[in-house]
Amino acid sequence: MAQSAITTELVPISGLTAAQRAAWRGMRAENPALASPYFALEFADLIADRRHDAQALVLTRKGRTAGFLPMQLSGWGVARPLGGPLGDHHGLITDDDTLDLGAALRGSAASVFCFHGAPASQTGFAAAASQIEPSWSIDLSDGCDAWLENRRLADAKAMRNIRARQRKLAESGLDITYRLDDRRPEALAATFANKREQYRRTNAFDVFIAKWARDLIDDLFEHQTPQLRGCLSTLEINGQLAAAHFGMRSETVLHYWFPVFWPEYANYGPGLQLLLEMAREMASDGIDTIHLGPGDVDFKRKLANASFDVASGRIQRPSMAASLMAAGAGMDAFARKLPLGRVARWPGKALHRLDTLAAAYGI
C-alpha cells in the first residue's frame, strides 16, 4: 500500500478522541512488541498531566487510524520520546511496523525526531538508525526456576557466586524482610533520595532535577491498574532498607527501572537478591518478561536469557534544528578520529549531556 496515502495530525495527548484512544489500546493489544508499560495509553496520560508538550502524531490512512507517534515537541521543532531521559523504550503505536515515518514527519511541525530506544522491528526507525543494539530481558514464560537453570548452564561461575551470596544472607542470622509491593511513601522517598545521591556520587545526569519527573514517579506510585502500575519493591535487613527498586509493569511486562542499594550491605549483594525475589514472585503474578533495557552492563548480560533490538538515531527533514544537530554530530565524529585518547570523547559527552538537559526541560 502506498505510504503517500498517509496523512498526519499533531494532537495533544489530552486532546485524543474516544475513538483514537480505543484505536491506541486496540493496536497495542494486537502487537506483542508493544507489551511494555511504556506503550500504555495511561503512561502517555500521566506524562501529559505533568508536561504541556506531550503530543501524539496521529497517522491516518484511507480514513482509518494507522498509528500514533507519542512525543514531546519543543518550540523549535525538535521532537523526543515521551518522558525524555526516562523514556527507555518508545516508538509507534501501530499494527503496521512498515509505516514510513519520514513521510509522516514531513507533514508535521516536528522537523527532527530523536530516538534512542525504538523497536528495530519498526522499519522506519531501523532505516534511520545510527546504532542498533540489544535491549536485554529476562524471559519468565517457563517459570523462574527454568530461567535460573538457563543462566546456570550459560555461566556456572556467575550463578555459583549468586547462590553463595544468597546463602551468606540466609545464614547471617539477620532479620530479612522482602516487600515486593511496598506501598509505604516513606520507602519511596528514601529510594529516590538514595538514587539521587548515587547520581551525584557518580557524576551521572540527575533527571529528577526537573519537578515533572519527580511528580511522575509519585503519580506512577499511586497509579494501580492492570495496564499500568508503579511497583516499589524493597529488602530490609534488621529493619533498615538494604535495597530497593522502583519500576512499572503492564499486564505481562515489568520494566526494571530504578534499582538502588545501601553500601553498608554491599557484601550481601542486596540488589541482586531483591531482583531474584521479584522475578520469582512476579512470575506467579502474570509477568512473563522483565525488561532490563539496553546497555553493555555486566549484570544485564549475565541475567538476561533474551533480548530484542532497539534503534537510536534521528528522523529529520531539512531545517535549522536538523542542521544544528548534524553539525554537533559532525564535530563529535571529527574529534573521535583525533589521537587524543579519552579527550576525543569529550565533545560527544558534552553534546549528550546538553541533549539530555533539553529533553528534561523541553527545550
Which residue ranges define each predicted feature?
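Aromatic (often tryptophan-rich) hydrophobic motifs at membrane interfaces
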Residues: 77, 99-107, 207-325
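ATP-hydrolysis module of ASCE/P-loop NTPase motor domains
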Residues: 106-123
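Acyl-group handling in specialized metabolite and lipid biosynthesis
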Residues: 89-94, 147-150, 179-181
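Active-site/acyl-donor-binding loops of N-acyltransferases
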Residues: 2-7, 122-153, 251, 284-347, ...
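Short loop segments at secondary-structure junctions
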Residues: 62-63, 96-97, 139-143, 238, ...
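A conserved beta-strand-loop-helix scaffold within acyl/acetyltransferase catalytic domains
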Residues: 8-62, 66-79, 118-123, 127-135, ...
